[in-house]
Curated annotation (Swiss-Prot):
The organism of origin for this protein: Nephroselmis olivacea (Green alga)
Organism lineage: Eukaryota, Viridiplantae, Chlorophyta, Nephroselmidophyceae, Nephroselmidales
Other facts noted in the record for this chain: 2 of the reaction center chlorophylls (ChlD1 and ChlD2) are entirely coordinated by water.
Record's protein name: Photosystem II D2 protein
InterPro entries linked: D1/D2, Photo_II_D1/D2_sf, Photo_RC_L/M, Photo_RC_L/M_CS, PSII_PsbD/D2
Molecular functions (GO terms): chlorophyll binding; electron transporter, transferring electrons within the cyclic electron transport pathway of photosynthesis activity; iron ion binding; oxygen evolving activity
Membrane topology: Multi-pass membrane protein
Family: Belongs to the reaction center PufL/M/PsbA/D family.
Organism domain of life: Eukaryota
Gene3D superfamilies for this protein: Photosystem II protein D1-like
Reaction(s) this enzyme catalyzes, per UniProt: 2 a plastoquinone + 4 hnu + 2 H2O = 2 a plastoquinol + O2
Binding positions (a plastoquinone): H214, F261
EC number of this enzyme: 1.10.3.9
Length: 352
């Protein structure tokens, strides 16, 4: 008698079927990360388009901020809630709006809606890169690199206002609104003199320089695959083998600077390291500002400038500019504080 011994087929459940459907090879990959990314990105972008088109900032900032009121793509914004809302999540069904959509928009509920959905959407996009990299056997450095922009977004739009008195002090979602927030950061925190800002600028501009140098060097050292006179005819874009000479590039930069990258791994790691580290440093600096930490204070120069009218440095001049920014912005931004400044220090009309 023959007895066949085999392993019974495992029963597939709903989770297995869902996993198969989510991770199926299709034109646009969905994946488990898509369950977070796609709805959050949809709601964040949709909320921003709705707010910039229809919703006023009159009740929160005393401003016009929508296309309906005459703004354009550079001046429209979804503005932050009023300072009196503090750190309320401003849920549509919460005690502030009580289910009234119009009132919710007037109070600034769209801003918290966009900020929270936008944060989770960015995190979902990073998880998407992890998931696809894992599926096809890549290292996860793309996702790690994307943590740089995420850290900046979260620190500026969420952590900074959490350290202040309310969401009011976060940037509104608009081009001119972001510019205004940058001026605010300078006036109230002297942000340009902050070492973390300096590292961020060095990282971002250094990365731009590295990209330009790298792209130009690769184009300069392409292997010719034809007799064309220009780059676009001199090689076949679908050729399987390597297309440029690292040895030639190394020799060129060795002659220019005396040093050069010896291998591609170190070169490309450096191109990853510079911008991502710069963004992380900026995010750390903004977290410090959330706690109102000071940066550099050159008190000796301030004291000497106060005593000697002929002594002035770019640092002391910038401090006076910062005082002007504070005097102008505070009274406009926070009318409920009833801040009063002497007439001689305030601007007249639109004159700077």
């Amino acid at each position: 008698m023959t007895i066949a011994i085999g392993t019974p087929e495992e029963k597939r459940g709903l989770f297995d079927d869902m996993d198969d459907w989510l991770r199926r090879d299709r034109f646009v990959f969905v994946g488990w990360s898509g369950l977070l990314l796609l709805p959050c990105a949809y709601f964040a972008v949709g909320g921003w388009l709705t707010g910039t088109t229809f919703v006023t900032s009159w009740y929160t900032h005393g401003l016009a901020s929508s296309y309906l009121e005459g703004c354009n793509v550079l001046t429209a914004a979804v503005s932050t809630p009023a300072n009196s809302m503090a750190h309320s999540l401003l849920l549509l069904w919460g005690p502030e709006a009580q289910g009234d959509f119009t009132r919710w928009c007037q109070l600034g509920g769209l801003w918290t809606f966009i900020a929270l959905h936008g944060s989770f959407g960015l995190i979902g996009f990073m998880l998407r890169q992890f998931e696809i990299a894992r599926a096809i056997g890549l290292r996860p450095y793309n996702a790690i690199a994307f943590s740089g922009p995420i850290s900046v977004f979260v620190s500026v739009f969420l952590i900074y206002p959490l350290g202040q008195s309310g969401w009011f002090f976060a940037p509104s979602f608009g081009v001119a609104a972001i510019f205004r927030f940058i001026l605010f950061f300078q006036g109230f925190h002297n942000w340009t003199l902050n070492p973390f800002h300096m590292m961020g600028v060095a990282g971002v501009l250094g990365a731009a320089l590295l990209c330009a140098i790298h792209g130009a060097t690769v184009e300069n050292t392409l292997f010719e695959d034809g007799d064309g006179a220009n780059t676009f005819r001199a090689f076949n874009p679908t050729q399987a083998e390597e297309t440029y000479s690292m040895v030639t590039a190394n020799r060129f930069w060795s002659q220019i600077f005396g040093i050069a990258f010896s291998n591609k791994r170190w070169l490309h790691f450096f191109m990853l390291f510079v911008p991502v580290t710069g963004l992380w440093m900026s995010a750390i600096g903004v977290v410090g500002l959330a706690l109102n930490l000071r940066a550099y204070d050159f008190v000796s120069q301030e004291l000497r400038a106060a005593e000697d009218p002929e002594f002035e440095t770019f640092y002391t001049k910038n401090l006076l500019l910062n005082e002007g920014i504070r005097a102008w912005m505070a009274a406009q931004d926070q009318p409920h504080e009833k801040l009063v400044f002497p007439e001689e220090v305030l601007p007249r009309g639109n004159a700077l």
